[in-house]
UniProtKB/Swiss-Prot annotation:
Record key words, sorted: Lipid metabolism, Metal-binding, Phosphoprotein, Prenyltransferase, Repeat, Transferase, Zinc
GO molecular function terms noted in the UniProt entry: acetyltransferase activator activity; enzyme binding; peptide binding; protein farnesyltransferase activity; zinc ion binding
Ligand binding (Zn(2+)): D297, C299, H362
Taxonomic path: Eukaryota, Metazoa, Chordata, Craniata, Vertebrata
PFTB repeat start and end residues: 123-164, 174-215, 222-263, 270-312, 332-374
Gene3D superfamilies: 1.50.10.20
Ligand binding ((2E,6E)-farnesyl diphosphate): H248, G249, G250, Y251, R291, C292, N293, K294, Y300, S301, F302, W303
Protein name: Protein farnesyltransferase subunit beta
The organism of origin for this protein: Homo sapiens
Positions bearing Phosphothreonine: T436
UniProt similarity note: Belongs to the protein prenyltransferase subunit beta family.
Length: 437
């Protein structure tokens, strides 16, 4: 995990001030931010115009129905939606049979952001289920008896760290997990997602995340990884899945977060990356797109906005005098407005954009992005601003791991008390060698 500095990620819960300014998206001049296609229609411009029209309807309806606009996060409805999902899912989720640890993580993290306690019986049931997903070869599969894969391994470790009990921590077979990571490591520093699978930046991040949380990083496990990730940064400034590919929000987050863990952020052109990610916030909608010329999507409220705390800290460490000491480098108010007005399902749960269905994935990442937009800095530089009613305030999330900062500290403290698997044996063997003249 990255070493602490004067600018840290930990934002303790506080009495957050409430935004008193008029809503950004309800200003009379806001319509000027809509797409101007210069009378040259394309497939993408037509789709963008359709989305903007739907969002304009939401903005107009809100303005018409609220004489004094006060945005409200429907906490109770979201809580009940999440609570039901932990116990029972409809057959619509059959397609996610290989993503069951993800469902645990998405729901548990959403609950911790809402500051909803996880009952002990539920925590125990989740632990027992995830133990069934752990492979004898190391790592976790998408369900009991499935092949291990780095994506559900990341989700399972995060879920267990959110639960944060000794019972949860001890489910993770650290020795086998380290062996599994070595089996995926490639000569160029990259990692396979699973044995015989594809290589991309996600796997490097998932490996770095679980290894750093559980204290199994060895001197050579990530040899060459930072250099490989740096080759994935392209001319746009963002990061693609592999070298030479188009920059994408999800891959960019994974790449930068992995480098933060490895303390190699300076391997990237940070100013170019900053320009790319800030250009992904949509002028009219207020949310983020994942790639250039794509539509807004609520999940990028985290994948893109979550990059800004990482960049802020990296640039702060370089002594950049232009950095704000009270706000991230994106329009925090506009993002909060998009999530609260456009991404909440009336029945509970959050979604991609108006017209889309709710799901646990978007619920998790919309709430994560909302938390990022509410909380800035820590200590003397703590500056929290919550849009709408005070009850909208969420718990902070760690932008590297996307679980509570306190859960990161708790997990790393626990696992740092244990030796890195194999390291002590190697040290003992070395010390047992006879001295030479």
């Amino acid at each position: 995990m990255a070493s602490p500095s004067s600018f840290t990620y930990y934002c303790p819960p506080s009495s957050s001030p409430v935004w008193s300014e008029p809503l950004y998206s309800l200003r009379p001049e806001h319509a000027r931010e809509r797409l101007q296609d210069d009378s040259v229609e394309t497939v993408t411009s037509i789709e963008q115009a359709k989305v903007e029209e739907k969002i304009q309807e939401v903005f107009s309806s809100y303005k018409f129905n609220h004489l004094v606009p006060r945005l409200v996060l429907q906490r109770e409805k979201h809580f009940h939606y999440l609570k039901r999902g932990l116990r029972q899912l409809t057959d619509a989720y059959e397609c996610l049979d290989a993503s069951r640890p993800w469902l645990c993580y998405w729901i548990l993290h959403s609950l911790e952001l809402l500051d909803e306690p996880i009952p002990q019986i539920v925590a125990t049931d989740v632990c027992q289920f995830l133990e069934l997903c752990q492979s004898p070869e190391g790592g976790f599969g998408g369900g009991p008896g499935q092949y291990p894969h780095l994506a559900p391994t990341y989700a399972a470790v995060n879920a267990l760290c959110i639960i944060g009990t000794e019972e949860a921590y001890d489910i993770i077979n650290r020795e086998k997990l380290l062996q599994y990571l070595y089996s995926l490591k490639q000569p160029d520093g990259s990692f396979l997602m699973h044995v015989g699978g594809e290589v991309d930046v996600r796997s490097a991040y998932c490996a770095a995340s679980v290894a750093s949380l559980t204290n199994i990083i060895t001197p050579d496990l990530f040899e060459g990884t930072a250099e490989w990730i740096a080759r994935c940064q392209n001319w746009e400034g963002g990061i693609g899945g592999v070298p030479g590919m188009e920059a994408h929000g999800g891959y960019t987050f994974c790449g930068l977060a992995a480098l933060v863990i490895l303390k190699r952020e300076r391997s990237l052109n940070l100013k170019s990356l900053l320009q790319w990610v800030t250009s992904r916030q949509m002028r009219f909608e207020g949310g983020f797109q994942g790639r250039c010329n794509k539509l807004v999507d609520g999940c990028y409220s985290f994948w893109q906005a979550g990059l800004l705390p990482l960049l802020h800290r990296a640039l702060h460490a370089q002594g950049d005098p232009a950095l704000s000491m009270s706000h991230w480098m994106f329009h925090q108010q506009a993002l909060q407005e998009y999530i609260l007005m456009c991404c909440q399902c009336p029945a509970g749960g959050l979604l991609d954009k108006p017209g889309k269905s709710r799901d646990f994935y978007h619920t998790c990442y919309c709430l994560s992005g909302l938390s990022i937009a509410q909380h800035f800095g820590s200590g003397a530089m703590l500056h929290d601003v919550v849009l709408g009613v005070p009850e909208n305030a969420l718990q902070p999330t760690h932008p590297v791991y996307n679980i509570g900062p306190d859960k990161v500290i708790q997990a790393t403290t626990y696992f740092l008390q244990k030796p890195v698997p194999g390291f002590e044996e190697l040290k003992d063997e070395t010390s047992a060698e006879p001295a030479t003249d």
